[in-house]
Amino acid sequence: MSLTTEGEALCQHADGLLDRFAALETELADRQNALNGTVRIAATFGFGRRWLGPALAAFQAQHPALQVELQLTEQLPDLGIQGYDGAIWLWSVQNRHASDWVTRRIARNQRVLAASPAYLQRRGLPADLPALATHDCLVARENGGAQPRPFDLWTLRHARDGSTARIRVQGALASNSGEMVRDWCLDGRGIMLRSLWDIAPQLASGELVRVLPHYAMPEADIHWVAPWRPRTPRRVRLLIDFLVEAFRTEPWKLEAPARPKPRRAKA
């Protein structure tokens, strides 16, 4: 069974009318001074719990008539079908050119190598990437997609010359929980690759130490991600502006603490 040419034209016209009605509904709602309605957002567990949750609570306190719903998940949901306004997600360079997505960067996401002083005293500080490959590394298998990903293959960029290298790491411990990997690292079980927003307090206190500090993972920054719509509600636009301003100074980014001097590992 298939539509006639006239039927296809009618369906396309109907789709256009629905978009216009949705835009008109949003425009009428925006004329209200006070924000109301519901904003529904998805985010990853780590950033959602540690940083996004408090920011959303602060925004809602400024707009008491507004409802905010935060869904924490490790898989990016189908935002349009499941009724989300958008998601706060790590969005890599490869994703940014997708025409059916609307994105805005919320914060920079720098991922660095770190270990505990106890581990470095026991195993030594790796002098270069080949030496890193001989160490116990803690692998986080987070945010997996439909396609399998080699989580033990780390891509690292040199801060000075911008060169990148891929290194396959080894280690006996891996988890789909970033918090678990961080706990293992604090317990002296190996070297991990984590976001600064996740471990800045431990770096500042000296519980963790940067390893190979001139290297970091190429950035997949934290973005507002949403499917394209004819018009974005005012409550959503103001929330995005609020989050950009809240994280503009990267509140987790602290001055690097004085580093202990563990012995260097032999190459």
Describe each PLM feature range.
Residues 163-210, 216-218, 224, 240:
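Hydrophobic hinge/microswitch elements
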Residues 4-7, 79, 132, 183-188, ...:
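Hydrophobic residues within well-ordered alpha-helices
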Residues 71-175:
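Acidic, Gly/Pro-rich loop/turn segments at junctions of secondary structure
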